Amino acid sequence: MDKKQLLRNLPKIDELLKEEIINRYLQENSRTLVVDSLRESIDHYRGEILKNNIDSFTKENVVNYFIDTLEENKSTKFKKVINATGVVIHTNLGRSLLAKEAIENVVKVSENYSNLEYDLKEGKRGSRYSHVEELIKKVTGAEAAMVVNNNAAAVMLALNTLCEEREAIVSRGQLVEIGGSFRVPDVMKFSRAHLVEVGTTNRTHLYDYENNINENTGVLLKVHTSNFKIMGFTEEVSSEEMVQLGEKYKLPVMEDIGSGTLVDFSKYGFTYEPTVQSSLEKGVDVVTFSGDKMLGGPQAGIIVGKKKYIDKMKKNQLTRALRIDKMTLAALEGTLKCYIDEKEAIENIPTLNMILSSKDIHKKRAQRLKRRLQNNVKDFNFKVSEDLSMVGGGSMPGERIPTYVVKVNSDKITAEKIEEKLRLSKNPIIVRVSKDEVILDVRTLFERDFNIIVEEFKKLLK
């Protein structure tokens, strides 16, 4: 059939609205939604005809496409996905998962009025920071604390407060890109601090900082390179040395820890990562870090340190533009409460639990998932193998966590096609692919995910 005839055969919306099946959908959905979905279906087939991609179609084809389109239009764009990649803090999949306590706190505060900026004792306006400041001070040992909407904002606010139109001295090897093309030099530029690079990419000495101090110096800045490692012939100035230099010249020392861990992971067999507490104990004046990375909470930028500096930041006009909302505060409060007892934090904060859970636990879980798949899904091969998970989120670069995975392949469908179908399924499942095998890392899976995975695998060859 020629192209013109195919185009003439496209059904009209009014014609389709008379179909019994469409009428059923009209009874359950708004007319606008149904008509828009019908229009999308007709437009789809018109486009396929014009591209010469089809040489025939039926009204039933158009209706079936409409049904899929309607369901897609009804569903939310922000979806739950199942993370089978083994990357714990997966930036593209939302980073850290919240603890149950944090979720309950968010629900309570979001469905009711709250004392967000109301002092119940005094009966007058209060500060939104008061809800978490005492908790942050308790778990970090800081004199004072405040929270903004992300760590880039925390760095910008701190620099703007400490050295607007003055110089911030930083090692050239610490001018990191923190993801999404956001770079420390760019954040500094918008803070109106003047960047002074010292040292080289791999080696920076104390005298590099001292030789560049002048009457216009505002801060000595240290940035933890949490998302990469420089190996070999390297040298960097310790926090203790920078604090001594700052005291000598009466300059504040600021450290951006980035991933912001409150747990010393070296106690559990990992490479040492500086903790917020250790930086403060060494005398660093201002420390900034993220809430949704190693802390395991919501997206937030947390600033801790000397009270005289934090108080100035609270009064900075930028603070209102960068402040966090009540739901983030509620989630952060629920997360921080877990840290009063480290054992409780590891048990209840999903990020910590996933990172620190032993591979033996995951071996048993991988075997359970394999059995369920084998018992319910035909034409696929399943095997349990040792593998390595990642922390992710620009944290612990180079660190790999021993784990167990389920590897999947089939003679009837390629691994790439399996990955695509799982990703586009009603319950999106994100996997890894290696050597024509699909890899399901159980470290980042919950038991509740297993049944969903089995059901989606059943549909792959249909």
From Swiss-Prot:
Positions bearing N6-(pyridoxal phosphate)lysine: 293
Main localization, broad class: cytoplasm
BP GO annotations: conversion of seryl-tRNAsec to selenocys-tRNAsec; selenocysteine incorporation
GO cellular component: cytoplasm
A GO molecular-function descriptor: L-seryl-tRNA(Sec) selenium transferase activity
Compartment annotation: Cytoplasm
Protein name in UniProt: L-seryl-tRNA(Sec) selenium transferase
Pfam families from the UniProt entry: Se-cys_synth_N, SelA
Family membership: Belongs to the SelA family.
Function (record text): Converts seryl-tRNA(Sec) to selenocysteinyl-tRNA(Sec) required for selenoprotein biosynthesis.
Species, as recorded: Clostridium botulinum (strain Loch Maree / Type A3)
Catalytic activity as recorded in UniProt: L-seryl-tRNA(Sec) + selenophosphate + H(+) = L-selenocysteinyl-tRNA(Sec) + phosphate
Gene: selA
Cited NCBIfam families: selA
